[in-house]
């Protein structure tokens, strides 16, 4: 039995997350007032049930000590508590609100949309810092968000650590869900070869180019060794996901190739591996 608290920025997908978890059998409560959460946790502890609670910014006090006191109170109960925080880039949130023409929950404070988003970010910081999992919904669909959540919940009963290798472009910003970020912008760049420029790191000519570079081989080898050294400690740390982000300038060539190579290596070592390329979709849209 466990209590899962879902919070995050307004517009980041909390309603989608709640529906997804309800679909897999969790008892879900939307916008439960903060003081009532310990009562729900006590009920769950006695009944042996699990539940999901979403926390809206309107139910979160401005005093961060209230959240810390709640978490301390929950830690004294026998039920396991996890916090999942949904994050999203500021510009994406602005676009989502513009598309739906809905009001931000803090707009009643006579704030502009941009100011409301920034204030909410400040108020949510204590929960962000306490979160067990952070999911960046900027570039993922509702289906992908639901799948990520199901993966996290499967990890609650499956002790195997899932290693996620993701490529990204620094020009689009850092992925918020990354545990480790490796910068490969110093490596030889296929972008400067006119024939390779329109291709990606998944295509054979780019693969051949990068495989000829000694620096690329050295980077992969040393990164692999670093991860292998610390994986046993991370696996003992009772975590479900380890997200390793590889970034180049545009997330199209070098980071894609290296993420693929690292993923293949750890798959060959019987690790539970997932791979995603965050920025490739942006290039396909051009």
From Swiss-Prot:
One of its GO terms (molecular function) is GTP binding. The keyword DNA-binding does not apply. Keywords: ATP-binding, GTP-binding, Nucleotide-binding. GTP binds at residues 56-59. SUPFAM superfamilies: P-loop containing nucleoside triphosphate hydrolases (SSF52540). Pfam families: PapZ_C, RapZ-like_N. ATP binds at residues 8-15. Displays ATPase and GTPase activities. Belongs to the RapZ-like family. This is Nucleotide-binding protein APL_0334. It comes from Actinobacillus pleuropneumoniae serotype 5b (strain L20).
């Amino acid at each position: 039995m466990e209590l899962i608290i879902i919070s995050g920025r307004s517009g980041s997908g909390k309603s989608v997350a709640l529906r997804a978890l309800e679909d897999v059998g969790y008892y879900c409560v939307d916008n439960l007032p903060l003081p009532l959460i310990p009562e729900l946790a006590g009920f769950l502890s006695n009944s042996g049930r699990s539940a999901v609670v979403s926390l809206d910014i309107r139910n979160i006090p401005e005093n961060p000590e209230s959240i810390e006191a709640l978490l301390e109170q929950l830690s004294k109960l026998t039920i396991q508590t996890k916090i999942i925080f949904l994050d999203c880039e500021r510009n994406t949130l602005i676009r989502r609100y513009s598309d739906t023409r809905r009001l931000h929950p803090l707009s009643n404070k006579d704030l502009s949309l941009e100011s409301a988003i920034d204030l909410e970010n400040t108020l949510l910081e204590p929960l962000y810092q306490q979160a067990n999992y952070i999911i960046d919904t900027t570039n993922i669909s509702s289906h992908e968000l639901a799948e990520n959540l199901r993966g996290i919940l499967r990890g609650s009963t499956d002790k195997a650590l899932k290693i996620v290798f993701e490529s990204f472009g620094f020009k689009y910003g850092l992925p918020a869900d990354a545990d480790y970020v490796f910068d490969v912008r110093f490596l030889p760049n296929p972008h400067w070869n006119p024939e390779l420029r329109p291709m990606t790191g998944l295509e054979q000519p780019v693969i051949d180019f990068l495989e000829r570079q000694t620096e690329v081989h050295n980077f992969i080898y040393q990164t692999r060794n670093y991860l292998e050294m610390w994986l046993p400690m991370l696996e003992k740390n009772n975590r479900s996901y380890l997200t390793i982000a590889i970034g180049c300038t545009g997330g199209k060539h070098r980071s894609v190739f290296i993420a693929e190579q690292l993923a293949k290596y750890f798959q060959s070592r019987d690790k539970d591996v997932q791979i995603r390329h965050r920025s490739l979709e942006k290039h396909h849209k051009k």
